[in-house]
Amino acid sequence: MQVKGVGQHHLRIGAAQLLSADALDRGCCSYGHEARGVDHAVGRMEASRTGLGMGTAMQQFELEWSSSAQHPKAVQLSPYGEAQDGSRTQALMLSWWPDLAGSWIFYTTLPLWPGITPRFERIARFAPVIGLFIGGAQAALWLLGRQLGLPSTSCALLVLTLGLWLSGGLHLDGVMDTGDGLAAGPRRLAAMADSRIGASGLVAGLMVLLLKVGALLALAVLAPTLLIWSAVWGRVAPLLAIAWFPYLRAEVSGGFHRQHRQPLLQELLPAAAVLGLLIGLSLSPPATRTVLAGLCGVIPTLLVPRLIGKRLGGHTGDSYGACVEWTEAFSLWSGWLMLRLLS
């Protein structure tokens, strides 16, 4: 078994002295003897174990050493860093908050929540929750605009502007960069990394916006509901891209999504909770067809990341953003098509 320190964690020795996690590379039994007379130490360590036919499994442990014990006491931690005991569910829920706060900071332009330190390694799984918020804000603005007598075209433009403001244009920028890359052939990665927008990228961005405006006008009174569904589906699509395809620019910071990912089913848990909430809120018979229209968004959610990934040979941070925007647009249209079939 190979034992190493976890990230930037340190080992607390006595009341004040700290031993760097780098020193833990020498093993879990030796570090106590290097404590220079301090008789107690507690810290976190990570063990990588190779099982038969199962590859390498990463586990976290909390170690406690004292001079009276021959070996450190190890308590296995869950993948989220909390002890695996009867309170695991509660600990798991509490450990989600820093990731959700990190997702809030990364995917929106809104300020950080007070009292929570964000964590960014696994923020992608909470993107659908952010989508629920953004889609809900857009739906509320649509309803307010209609209540004030604004025409549908004005409402459509307003809600798209709100979405761009809340996201900082992060995903639309990915659409344009990916459009340039897809048109550049073998130089696609260089074209996507270029901060200048080419003709293909500009056309791709306009296409996405026009598709959304057209779909919202076609949906009319059901536009607010489908706005929420599409915003959630759009942020599920990158999770599939992360799971299915390699990251093409590992040296770029966007690769941390894939580096820190867990099995796909675990990554989809927040999305499943959001989708279950949307279904539960629409179970009354008059809204059944709306639920079916919303669920149609699963089709572009499955297709868009696969099609883009096959064209590029993998994904980048830009193509993750493109997956969000194209999936949103096609989710709106697939919902409209389902409503037409049911009418």
What are the functions of these language-model segments?
Residues 3-5, 9-11, 18, 23-26, ...:
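Alpha-helix boundary/capping motif
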Residues 49, 74:
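Short polybasic linear motifs
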Residues 50-56, 88:
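Low-complexity, intrinsically disordered Ser/Thr/Pro- and acidic-rich segments
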Residues 59-65, 71, 77-168, 186-189, ...:
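Hydrophobic alpha-helical transmembrane segments
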Residues 173-174:
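Glycine-rich active-site/cofactor-binding loop and its immediate structural neighborhood
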Residues 183:
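Structural signature of FAD isoalloxazine-binding scaffolds in flavoprotein oxidoreductases
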